[in-house]
């Protein structure tokens, strides 16, 4: 049985892009008598190795941002303890304030820091911090919460999606929608847009139709915090392109799966999401401060204020690299415009890096993903006050958590059961997953794990004031109110599973996918190339790997071996590239080449994401020079390295790639040697597919063609020129 896609691990380290090189190299050639190893154990080995490494390093780390401040805190404890004793003898009214600003005549502000040892120890213990118990900002300290809230508050609007979705949902209506979702009853609507986008909207079936929201062309129509309106208007004088059709559902707190992310529209989508996340955090804080003031004024009344969750973090970002995290932070600060950013230098020093100038020839999507610091092991907490944003805040004092799936899971799934913690995800109200296709190439199992632990009831109170917890939290219905937004360059079965399994928003959900012209129409070659797609029958996804392997060895490989044998000694005998999307399929085919009688006279090389750089270079050289007739090549290796393989005269695709850009790039290998271009065009491309490859195949051959190729009864071979 084939493993779920994206299960291969990623290693830790500063340069985590590309083959991690943790497996022993494998070289096999019947002609050259190159030794083979026994690295066909699948993917469990590297996963355990990297996870154990990450867990070991995290055992001493508090649940918080990537770089903890434990050493710094310890160094300050003796002084703080002495200070506490002095304060006890001189001021018995209470602990010293943590921060206070002193205004001088020259208008310079000097910040005097007096640490409260008790508060410090509470933070170390990951204790008791939620929105009500947040550390006071300068204006909120000393009873000035009313003034602080008034300066930056807005009148509540019954039409504000924040209030209608989170604050004032009707309990009866909410119960009806949750019941419909639990019974998987949805009303659906579909439409196509002139921008080449297909939309599918689903709402809980409570009698209402799934209507469409009008396009959002002006950001002024969004109910924004007063502080955000001006910078938002400056950044978005108008919303253009596909974003204007997606924005209404984002700001309307509906679940969104957007499958048309590109390097050209990613910045606009990132800014929209940053504005939405910041707006949500500020409104949450504003409601809490207002209610604090009301409760302080009316202490003798029976006010029932429900404005909080169990813990403070409200927004979760899942991102592929540290540089992607920095870009998201920059988008947030562009709108929030804080007067002070604590630990910003530390953030830039540890999360940001310059682009590699040698990558100018790489594709745009590669440079966007791997440019700068491409480390995929990180987590970062952001804490907001009225004028300040603090980076590297502990999770239980953070408003926004940004992390890679690997970085977050190492905290949640530590080897020591007692240290495992996921309570900080109990009150997440907005989840943003950007560049999900890149996360698929890391390890999708981490995504699944995190999704399953969202909005669970916390195991500890963490200082929660349960009298102010919203009712739908107490009823364990937070997952039905939570908003999830996922951006990806293409939609896969794994992402569709998230859409159907974890997107249960009572306000509805939307999936947007592009109408594909097909990668076969955009080949970077000056001549036409024969492209043949062969369908094989398979009854279920579980049987796909065996059926694919049987068809490959009995039909395609037998023909390839005959051609190589008949052309031995001729230039045409070599140059066959076999592209294999799955690593486990790669291992299976590689072992067959190494041990089967069928391939006794075939010299071959094999390179994957685990092959050492030196071994990969040697295999590429042998293949280019004709010393090896066949080269096995994986999709994840191409994703991380984007090699330009020379010497390719024919291409066999064991399966079509997930990323349609890879199809064009790999077929483009045929044109790297102009002298052999005509011969390569005759050799062409041959690809295998089954009905379970429908999503991938649609991106390769186009939306209009894929239906006939799946249903065709008259034959199973389709050729395009």
Swiss-Prot record:
Keywords: Nucleus, Ribonucleoprotein, Ribosome biogenesis, rRNA processing. One of its GO terms (biological process) is maturation of SSU-rRNA from tricistronic rRNA transcript (SSU-rRNA, 5.8S rRNA, LSU-rRNA). Its main location: nucleus. It is found in: Nucleus, Nucleolus. It comes from the Eukaryota. The keyword Nucleus applies. Residues 1-171 are annotated as: Disordered. It holds the Pfam family Utp25_C. GO terms for molecular function: rRNA binding; U3 snoRNA binding. Residues 54-73, 118-144, 152-161 have a biased composition (Acidic residues). Residues 7-17 have a biased composition (Basic residues). One of its GO terms (cellular component) is nucleolus. Residues 21-33, 104-117 have a biased composition (Basic and acidic residues). Component of the ribosomal small subunit (SSU) processome composed of at least 40 protein subunits and snoRNA U3. Belongs to the UTP25 family. PANTHER family: ORF PROTEIN-RELATED, U3 SMALL NUCLEOLAR RNA-ASSOCIATED PROTEIN 25 HOMOLOG. DEAD-box RNA helicase-like protein required for pre-18S rRNA processing, specifically at sites A0, A1, and A2. This is U3 small nucleolar RNA-associated protein 25. It comes from Aspergillus niger (strain ATCC MYA-4892 / CBS 513.88 / FGSC A1513). The gene is utp25.
